[in-house]
UniProtKB/Swiss-Prot annotation:
InterPro entries: RNA_pol_sigma_r3/r4-like, UPF0251, WH-like_DNA-bd_sf. It comes from Vibrio parahaemolyticus serotype O3:K6 (strain RIMD 2210633). This is UPF0251 protein VPA0321. Pfam families: DUF134. Transmembrane segments: none annotated. Belongs to the UPF0251 family. It comes from the Bacteria. Signal peptide: none annotated. Gene3D superfamilies: Winged helix-like DNA-binding domain superfamily/Winged helix DNA-binding domain.
Amino acid sequence: MARPKIERRICGRAAHHCFKPNGVPFHQLEQVAILPEELEALRLADLEGLSQQQAADQMGISRQTFGNTVKSARFKVAKSLVEGHALVFPNEESNL
């Protein structure tokens, strides 16, 4: 049986639904979904400049979990930028 996922504290949401390369129709692009907790981890680490421990405390998760989350988010952003994919920000009601 899988361990239950600890609820993360998330203070905001993305300003837009997605970011994509200019001039390419959305339906022609591969989509890379970044989860709300991944976006929050990026915000805390890269925008706010918090240490991993400070950011983990603010999200209510362990430092190790925070590190894994921000690593996953950075990979998805880099993949989208380098390979020209659409980066989408699904909300809790989405099925992505």
